[in-house]
Amino acid sequence: PALILVGVILLFSKGIDLQPGDSAPDFALTDESGVEHRLSDYLGKPVVVYFYPKDDTPGCTKEACAFRDDNPLFEELGVRVFGISYDSPKSHRRFKSKYDIPFTLLSDSDKTVAKSYGAAGLIFPKRVTFIIDEEGKISKVYEKVSVTTHSREILDFLGTRTELLD
C-alpha cells in the first residue's frame, strides 16, 4: 500500500515547467486582509513568489521567519515578497500575527496559481520559489529549498552580500 501511495504521489508531482526568461503567469489572489493583489500591479520592481505547504507548520514557520528577519534587506532592494499557500486568509492572518510576519501572504485556495506555476502538489503546494524581474520575467527558480537559508540564498542572487550581515 505504501509503495502504491508513493507511486500515485510521483505520478501527480510534475516538475516545474517555467524557466528563467519565461513570462511569469499573472495572478490575482487575496491576502490575509482580504485585499486582492495582481502580479501585474508590481511590474517595475522585482518580486519573490514563494510557495509553501501550510501555515504554522515547522518548516514553513522557519522559512517565513527567515524571510521576516531579512525583510529589511528585501525592502532596501525594492523587492516585494509574496508567500503563497492553499490556506485561507483567516489562517494567514493568524500565522502573520503569531510570528510578526511583515510581508504579504496570499491565499490560493483553489490551487489555480500553484498549477500555473507548476507548484501544485497533491495535498499541499510544493516548496518552490520564483524570482520575477521588473519586466515580469522569471529570473530564477528554486526547486530545492533549505527553509533556514533560503532567504539569504535569494538575497545573494539579488546581489546582497549577506555574509557581511552575520
PLM features: residue spans?
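N-terminal targeting signals for export/organelle localization
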Residues: P1-T30, D166
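Short, small/polar residue-rich loop motifs at catalytic or cofactor-binding pockets
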Residues: S23, P46, F124-K126
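A short beta-strand-turn-helix
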Residues: A28-V47
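Hydrophobic beta-strand anchors of alpha/beta hydrolase catalytic cores
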Residues: V48-V49, V81
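Conserved redox-active cysteine motifs that mediate thiol-disulfide chemistry
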Residues: F51-D69, L73
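Short, internal strand/loop/helix patches
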Residues: F82, R93-V128
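Thiol-/selenol-based redox modules, centered on thioredoxin-like
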Residues: P125-D166
